[in-house]
Design a protein with these regions (language model features):
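The canonical Cys-X-X-Cys-His
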Residues: 30-39, 88
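Axial heme c-ligation environment in periplasmic c-type cytochrome domains
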Residues: 43-53, 63-97
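Electrostatic cytochrome c docking/interface patches
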Residues: 11-28, 40-51, 58
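Post-cleavage N-terminal segment of exported redox proteins
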Residues: 1-23, 91-97
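Secondary-structure boundary/capping signal
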Residues: 5, 20-21, 33, 73, ...
Length: 97
């Protein structure tokens, strides 16, 4: 019984960590996107490059990231969830405003 309670508590803790990660676009960007987007176009915060991209809308950009485009492989070459991708896209767009 003690092991079952410990197991449930551990799983609950992991679940809450995943929820925080999904909601934190900056953390997702820093871990999974910045390696390329800090060095290559469109760079984070480049308003001239991101302006036209952002006009397509979040849903369209998330779909592009999931599918991949140009030099960017599907999901940026990561195993991110769609929710994490959306959070990162929203963060990147917010830095271009």
């Amino acid at each position: 019984m003690k092991l079952a309670i410990i197991g449930i508590a551990t799983l609950a803790g992991l679940f809450s960590i995943d929820q925080v990660a999904a909601a934190d676009g900056k953390a997702v960007y820093d871990k999974s996107c910045g390696g390329c987007h800090n060095a290559m176009d469109p760079k984070l915060g480049d308003k001239a490059k991101w302006g036209p991209i952002a006009k397509r809308g979040t849903d369209a950009l998330v779909a592009t990231v999931i599918k991949g485009k140009g030099a960017m492989p599907p999901k940026g070459g990561t195993t991110l969830s769609n929710e994490d991708i959306k959070a990162a896209v929203e963060y990147m767009i917010s830095k271009a405003k």
